[in-house]
């Protein structure tokens, strides 16, 4: 699915919610038009793929995006999150995440 053309998508909420075994690369995705990613990887307990190259500057909702992604520990320091309105619980119960997000 890394080669899917998602460039026209604006809503990716719940896309992989509950996919406990999912751990496939998505680094080639063009997400520049996505406005909401809330709950996108919630309960994806094995997911740990790089997403640092994603252009998320149009995203407004990242609520619970990585909640209960117990293995996710990838850098996100290049993300421009200046338009995000809610990050509530973005890393809730994510036991591995230990990246610099400043």
Q: What role is predicted for each listed range?
A:
Residues 1-102:
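Negatively charged
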